[in-house]
């Protein structure tokens, strides 16, 4: 991914995604190439609220939240592809996940690197290949399908 690298800080991310604490799971975009892919990161802190119950004696980031982090990175790539006319009223919905696999636990102190590659766009559905890594090792991977709607439209 490297012809034109776009780097987004948390301030720009907050203008593009409707998510807020505790569910905003992208801290920074390291690289973004429209029509190709995105590389983003999530710094995983012991202060994450989900660690209180998952699991108190051995905190592990829930796999579903790793997938959510990948979906949020995909949303940022989508919004780079197709700028929403009304960002305040635009939502990004999951419509499917294929081949989700979890290969390594993600623990407090890890830096989760989110790599999402554009696969195709057909009839309002975006498809992506998504891989989350820690220290260069795959933690999770999946194919994600998503759509963009206005907040007042049914998903």
Curated annotation (Swiss-Prot):
It is an enzyme of class 4 (lyase). Its main location: cytoplasm. One of its GO terms (biological process) is fatty acid biosynthetic process. GO terms for molecular function: (3R)-hydroxyacyl-[acyl-carrier-protein] dehydratase activity. The keyword Lipoprotein does not apply. It comes from the Bacteria. The active site is at residue 54. It catalyses: a (3R)-hydroxyacyl-[ACP] = a (2E)-enoyl-[ACP] + H2O. InterPro entries: FabA_FabZ, FabZ, HotDog_dom_sf. Its EC number is 4.2.1.59. Gene3D superfamilies: Hotdog Thioesterase (3.10.129.10). GO terms for cellular component: cytoplasm; membrane. It is found in: Cytoplasm. Keywords: Cytoplasm, Lipid A biosynthesis, Lipid biosynthesis, Lipid metabolism, Lyase. HAMAP family: FabZ. Involved in unsaturated fatty acids biosynthesis. Catalyzes the dehydration of short chain beta-hydroxyacyl-ACPs and long chain saturated and unsaturated beta-hydroxyacyl-ACPs. Belongs to the thioester dehydratase family. FabZ subfamily. This is 3-hydroxyacyl-[acyl-carrier-protein] dehydratase FabZ. The gene is fabZ.
């Amino acid at each position: 991914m490297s012809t034109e690298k776009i780097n987004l800080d948390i301030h720009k991310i907050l203008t593009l995604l409707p998510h807020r604490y505790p569910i905003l799971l992208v801290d920074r975009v390291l690289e973004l190439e429209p029509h190709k892919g995105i590389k983003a990161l999530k710094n995983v802190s012991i202060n994450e609220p989900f660690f209180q119950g998952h699991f108190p004696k051995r905190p592990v980031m829930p796999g579903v939240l790793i997938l959510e982090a990948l979906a949020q990175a995909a949303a940022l790539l989508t919004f780079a592809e197709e700028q929403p006319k009304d960002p305040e009223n635009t939502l990004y919905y999951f419509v499917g996940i294929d081949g989700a696999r979890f290969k390594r636990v993600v623990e407090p102190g890890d830096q989760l690197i989110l790599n999402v590659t554009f696969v195709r766009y057909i009839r309002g559905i975006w498809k992506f290949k998504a891989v989350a890594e820690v220290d260069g090792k795959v933690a999770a991977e999946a194919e994600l399908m998503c759509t963009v709607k206005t907040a007042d439209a049914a998903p």
